[in-house]
Amino acid sequence: MPYPANYGGVIDVFYKLKALHSLGIEIYFHVFEYGRGEQKELNKYCKEVFYYPRNSFIKSFLSVDPFIVKTRANDDLIKNINKYDFPILFEGLHTTIPIQLEKLNGQKTYVRAHNIEHNFYKGLAKSESNVFKRNFFKQEAEKLKRYEKILLNVDGVFTISPNEQKYFRKKYGVKCKYIPAFHDTEIHTNLEVKGNFILYHGNVSVSENVKAALFLIDTYKDSIYQLVIASSYVNDQLAIEIVKHKNIRFHSLQGEDDLNRLFENAHINVLPTFQNTGIKLKLLNTLYQGKFVIANDFMIDDTGLESLCEKANTKEEFLTKTKELLDKTFDPKIVETRKKILHNFSPIESAKKIIDIILTRDRHLK
């Protein structure tokens, strides 16, 4: 479910819908709903929206297919897709089971590769302290590595970062095309207000983000700085740590506008990650909507966005950069610099590339 678009994993999907719609593309959107509810906002950009439940978790654990794939096997999905002879864009490897089951009617098929999935799950296993979850992530990584060969059977793969383009191009050939991540391009930053706290936002149901949040708690817990950790999900482990420190609080995100208000009032956005996978959508989103950004190597290396961020890797470096930036006001010139560099990540230009590739496939994939 890509709305509200308030964490990295759904930002690319939602703003891709908006961009394609703005260019006149009719979209029949198929979405698995598990907790976020049906969203009327999607009707603004889609001709029709179909909702499906995920399958039994217990049965899916026992499958030779990856859990994230097997839980999305759905007969109604295949029936609805086969009503039309339109090209199909699968959002992530995990949505591709209709291809694996060989139940499509010959439609052109394309996959948006959000990550090198088996590497992503290996990283989750390394970040996970729970033994059961760690073993699950390891097994899922192995299954995903085997399952990835399904990309041999699709007409095109749209990669999300230059590094991952190299990987997919080497394995699956010229049908792999780099399409920069989709994101919100509206500048929300209120330049007249100097922010008064430090913000970290992310989906803390994901162990990688929990690890990043714990790192930040440990970094700022004995400082004079106010840290806000924002997520639409409440993590018990983080809640226990946060309550110990008066200068750190949790903000439960209620919607996209809620996150925008935090961006407007935060002076610094801190974005550490411990996985060098894909491009972090939260980085792009923050550069458009937030003020200063401090990020580590894993977050910004080889993104083309290095010059727009302050780099810090250790706790000491984060604290030093924080002190420096809190003494500065956010100059409007910074926004203009960002706009120039972020033009390379224009959602409209990326949407045009997708349309061009799909509509003139033979010319582009030779």
Which residues make up each language-model segment?
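Acidic donor-binding loop of glycosyltransferase active sites
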Residues: 263-278, 289-291
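Donor nucleotide-sugar binding/catalytic pocket of nucleotide-sugar-dependent glycosyltransferases
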Residues: 138-188
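Membrane-proximal helix-turn-helix segments that form the acceptor-binding/catalytic region
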Residues: 15, 75-82, 116-120, 128-157
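Conserved catalytic-core segment of nucleotide-activated headgroup transferases in glycan assembly
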Residues: 12, 178-242, 249-264
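Active-site proximal beta-strand in glycosyltransferases
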Residues: 87-88, 104-127
